[in-house]
Amino acid sequence: MFCNQCQEALNVIGCTKNGVCGKKGEVADLQDRLLYVLKSVSYYNLKARELGLNEETADKIVLDAFFATLTNTNFDKQAIESYIKKGFEIRDSIKAKLPAGTLPAEEDLPDVAKVTPENITGMDVAVHSTQNEDVRSLRELLTYGMKGMAAYAHHAYILGYKDEEIFKFIEKGLVATTDDTIGVDDLIGLVLECGQKGVSVLALLDKANTETYGSPEPTAVNIGVRGNPGILISGHDLLDLEQLLEQTKGTGIDVYTHGEMLPANSYPAFKKYDNFAGNYGNAWWRQNEEFEKFNGPVLMTTNCIIPPRESYRNRIYTTGVVGFEGLPHIHEKEDGTKDFTSLIEQAKMSKPPEQLESGTIMGGFAHEAALSVADKIIDAVKTGKISRFMVMAGCDGRHKERAYYTEFAKALPENTVILTAGCAKYRYNKLDLGDIGGIPRVLDAGQCNDCYSLVVIAQKLAEAFGLEDINDLPISYNIAWYEQKAVLVLLALLSLGVKNIVLGPTLPAFVSPNVLKVLVDNFNIRPNTTVEEDMKVLLG
């Protein structure tokens, strides 16, 4: 295997035997093959799309299977093999529908169009099959950005929201990574287009979530426990949460969020459930100790799952695109619903959660809530009560170097406000940083996709101050990345013209020196260093 798609890539180069994440080499190799099959599906669906014959089954397999290859999402060999089998079936179905003359002669077809279940095992389809370092780097940057795009499009899709242009771009991008006639300049263009489409998919998901569940509102979220047995839900999927809450109401079972599900506590639609108890624990990487102490069943809805300990292995379930060998999987029924009876019955026989902490933390400051007090914020900036906004969005991770973000938040002057989204928030959202005239010094917009809210807030503030360039606002960016959703968010920010981003805790292993130079020259991206040095740069 060779995998360097996440921030934990071994020695900032790549994992070659097993992943630091826990992914086995055999699964990594299968995921490489799956990705190549999705490129083949995309080749034919693009041809079909030109004729109005494209299939939604192709769009769905690309979203689902692409998402399954994200870091910490699907470790199940059989699930990946099933995606490969289904991909070939859909590919062949599309191919059979194409009118004669649509395709080149068989001998002129590219390899990606001729791949079969029989010959794919002997093909070199891994990252290093691309020899040119810069082409390889740009193909990876594009691929990982599109993985994030597929994940967000998947979340919107299950709520009934889709955008054909996003499907089309993902297919175009996947096929482009197999075309040796597409050089560095064109790949840079595709990477930038990926960022533009990233803004579109973030806006689509924001619309899907808010139109379905209401706009998040400032909420004091309980982080303690109650005396009832509970079910813990982790990941990002709000539809799974809705169904779980509906099925557990009146049962005496409480439901707690974990990790990136924390922002669900701020959506109006979920507040009607008396058994929605609050948030338990912290970011994904602490799940081993926290799931162990929860005592009840745990539902993993999307990334991020890590190899479970034996102590709770008999009470952790996967659903959706998540998979881990040996764990029970809750499948979606034909009508789109899921039956969580097995979790509910197990919860009834479980002890209540062990308390980890107590009190509340504030959330729910997405763009609508933040902009509802825009006048107050603008006045605070004009009077000097707020000197700067610090965007500290992104991902958390287990490396000790990430303590930097806690220390950075502590060291910020008292007249600065942190804007955050994603699980990076757990490094500082429980610090007592106070408020500025009633405005909390940590404004949490939500999940990683809610970085879109931070962009909307910045754009509206720029309008209010009469600025044409959001880089002229008193806003700085200290972004923490971990996986491929964060890659897309970064590309989306760049496509909007955001410059001077500090990125950490390490730069992506897949970015070559020449590609990094392009990012530095055009956007002034730089790696984080020390709290003291970065504070000087970011506070201007």
Curated annotation (Swiss-Prot):
Protein name in the entry: Hydroxylamine reductase
Residues annotated as binding [4Fe-4S] cluster: 3, 6, 15, 21
Disulfide bonds: none
Annotated source species: Methanosarcina mazei (strain ATCC BAA-159 / DSM 3647 / Goe1 / Go1 / JCM 11833 / OCM 88) (Methanosarcina frisia)
Gene assigned in the entry: hcp
Similarity field: Belongs to the HCP family.
InterPro entries documented for this protein: HCP/CODH, Hydroxylam_reduct, Prismane-like_a/b-sand, Prismane-like_sf, Prismane_a-bundle
Chief location category: cytoplasm
One Pfam family here: Prismane
Function: Catalyzes the reduction of hydroxylamine to form NH(3) and H(2)O.
Co-factor binding comment: Binds 1 [4Fe-4S] cluster.
